């Protein structure tokens, strides 16, 4: 069973947690979790997370943000990030799947091998990512939970 999350920082409606998990191959992976209280309607939060036009507004250091639908509640998202020297710019493709519930919506994501927005371009890929967003309706606000872990590549 993985260890409990440790609270790292808290303030202004945001709590940041982390934990280290021993993977099957012996490597350690860091999992982070954010819990954010947002004074905005639930539907608006879902729209910001799922619509291309908002991606660069909430995703820091993003040079490009694109979405391609793959089904009624699934899509591929593409982010190209700017990193300072000595790192190079990187890109990330994620498969996303949305599950709607009565009081909350979950968006699961994990790294994708797709290159639909950067075919033929040599770029460092951010891989081995998986996580989820959980958006919950509350009285007068929306609660947003974000989990992400970097999972070592197999092979």
Language-model-derived ranges and their functions:
Residues 1-155:
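Eukaryotic helix-grip
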């Amino acid at each position: 069973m993985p260890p409990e999350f440790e609270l790292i920082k808290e303030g202004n409606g945001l709590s940041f947690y982390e934990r280290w998990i021993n993977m099957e191959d012996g490597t350690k992976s860091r999992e982070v979790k954010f819990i954010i209280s947002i004074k905005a309607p639930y539907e608006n939060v879902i729209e910001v997370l799922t619509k291309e036009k908002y991606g660069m507004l909430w995703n820091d250091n993003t040079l490009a943000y694109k979405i391609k639908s793959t089904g009624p509640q699934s899509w591929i998202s593409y982010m190209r990030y700017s990193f300072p020297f000595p790192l190079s710019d990187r890109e990330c493709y994620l498969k996303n799947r949305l599950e709607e519930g009565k009081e909350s919506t979950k968006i699961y994501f994990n790294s994708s091998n797709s290159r639909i927005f950067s075919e033929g371009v040599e770029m460092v890929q951010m891989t081995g990512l998986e996580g989820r967003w959980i958006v919950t309706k509350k009285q007068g606000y929306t609660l947003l939970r974000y989990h992400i872990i970097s999972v070592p590549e197999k092979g």
